[in-house]
């Protein structure tokens, strides 16, 4: 069993935000409180991604292709509800955003990004070992727990289930890779546009990255986070 799977199955989810600066902790407490007020049947609010792992980027400015850009990691948050929020999800997220950014400098303040799952769907994904959701359980921080439900453990899948999951992963990643490859070909042939021509290398890297990501997803049902092609090649051996 992978350490990753062990953590997801047997180690309780983290609850402490002590590793984050006070400003970040305050933001996350505020967001959890607003979510509970705006969504009445919320059962869990989970921080995942770079802020959960402690690998976040607070502010990074650089110049790429002659354009000055800046990057900030988002607060990635999974909102688990009794039933999916549904068609009005974006409206709900907009209200949460509006309240959170009140009296804040929106352009240079960490933004929240939300996804929503019902507790039933979330637990089904955990039982089947869907790597995205299993990773959230293993690495995430529980910001709010109603205590009304327990999270499922990964169970042993039969070969039919393994095949279905692997096929879905393959279709998605292979489609992404081919999409990047087609755009790269078009850009390479369009030498009249220097920017498009220069972007070809980046697009080819994205295509190769997605092709390589597909292999461990299909054979291990695991998605590596690395973007280095050499590391992904090693993972495929």
Role assignments for model-derived ranges:
Residues 3-23, 99-186:
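Conserved NTP/Mg2+-binding pocket subregion across the NTase superfamily
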Residues 11-39, 58, 65-126:
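Metal-dependent nucleotidyltransferase catalytic core
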Residues 43-57, 61-64:
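Short gly/ser-rich loop at a beta-strand->alpha-helix junction or flexible surface loop bordering the NTP-binding
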Residues 51-54, 82-87, 208-209, 236-237:
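Short, charged/polar surface micro-motifs in flexible loops or helix N-caps
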Residues 76, 131, 199:
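Amphipathic alpha-helical recognition patches that constitute DNA-binding helices
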């Amino acid at each position: 069993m992978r350490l990753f799977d062990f953590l997801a199955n047997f180690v309780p989810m983290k609850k402490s935000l002590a590793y984050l600066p006070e400003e970040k902790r305050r933001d996350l407490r505020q967001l959890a409180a607003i979510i509970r007020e705006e969504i009445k049947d919320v059962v869990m609010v989970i921080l995942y991604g770079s802020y959960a792992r402690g690998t976040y980027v607070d502010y990074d400015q650089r110049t790429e292709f002659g354009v000055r850009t800046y990057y900030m990691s988002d607060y990635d948050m999974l909102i688990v509800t009794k039933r999916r929020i549904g068609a009005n999800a974006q409206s709900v997220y907009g209200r949460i955003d509006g309240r959170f950014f009140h009296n804040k400098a929106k352009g240079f303040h960490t933004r929240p990004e939300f996804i929503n799952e019902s507790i039933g769907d979330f637990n089904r994904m955990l039982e089947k070992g869907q790597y995205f959701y299993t990773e959230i359980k293993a690495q995430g921080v529980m910001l709010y727990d109603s205590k009304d439900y327990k999270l499922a453990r990964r169970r042993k899948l039969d070969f039919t289930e393994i095949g279905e999951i692997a096929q879905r992963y393959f279709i998605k990643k292979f489609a992404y890779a081919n999409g990047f490859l087609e755009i790269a070909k078009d850009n390479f042939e369009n030498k009249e546009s220097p920017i498009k021509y220069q972007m070809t290398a980046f697009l080819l890297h994205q295509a190769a990255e997605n092709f390589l990501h597909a292999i461990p997803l299909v054979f291990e049902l695991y998605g590596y986070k690395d973007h280095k092609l050499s590391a992904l090649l090693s993972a495929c051996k």
